[in-house]
A protein has these predicted regions:
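Bacterial Sec-dependent N-terminal signal peptides
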Residues: 1-26
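Alpha-helical structural motif
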Residues: 8, 69, 98-101
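N-terminal secretory signal peptides
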Residues: 22-70
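Low-complexity, flexible helical/coil segments
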Residues: 65-73, 124-127
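Low-complexity, intrinsically disordered regions in eukaryotic regulatory proteins
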Residues: 70-83
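Surface-exposed, polar helix/loop patches in the mature regions of secreted/periplasmic/lumenal proteins
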Residues: 82-145
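Long, low-complexity, intrinsically disordered segments
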Residues: 146-154
């Protein structure tokens, strides 16, 4: 019984890396950022920017290295004197989706006058694309399609 279990575990160990491998594919996206510091009441919105040299994960659709886009905004804010900013990045393949999320954030922070809202134009801050290295850009193994043959018995 233990031999069967070992065989199954060995097979699972060989299959899991193949299942988790996903290539990065070139995908243009719309992207914007939001930054705030919980030490004051100022919030910052970037413009919605079109980036044509970005990459997404072929399985999940997530922006490649998406945390680094937030770090870009955070470093920009720190260079401009904002202490401990918390930054988020919103992205989508469709501008309409980004505009919807942008409007929801803007509604939350711009109404009622509780926050000082500042807007960063593209000339103030622009995201820089992050390009994966060659090993991450290789195409993911594609599953072969099995043709269904119609065997008609006469």
């Amino acid at each position: 019984m233990t031999m069967k279990l070992r065989v199954y575990l060995a097979m699972a160990a060989m299959l899991i890396p193949a299942l988790t491998f996903a290539a990065q594919k070139h995908t243009p996206v719309y992207i914007c950022g939001f930054a705030t510091s919980f030490n004051d009441s100022t919030v910052y919105f970037t413009d919605i920017q079109y980036m044509d040299s970005t990459y997404t994960d072929s399985k999940t659709g997530f922006l490649y290295s998406r945390e680094n886009y937030s770090y870009q905004l955070r470093e920009h804010m720190q260079r401009n004197g904002v202490a401990n900013p918390t930054c988020i990045t919103i992205f989508s393949k469709k501008r309409k989706d980004v505009e919807k999320k942008y409007a929801a954030l803007k509604k939350r922070y711009a109404t009622k006058g509780r926050y000082d809202v500042k807007y960063l134009t593209t000339s103030d801050f622009a995201f820089t694309p992050i390009i994966p290295d060659e090993s991450e850009m290789k195409d993911a193994p594609k599953a072969q399609k099995v043709k269904k043959s119609k065997n008609k018995k006469k």
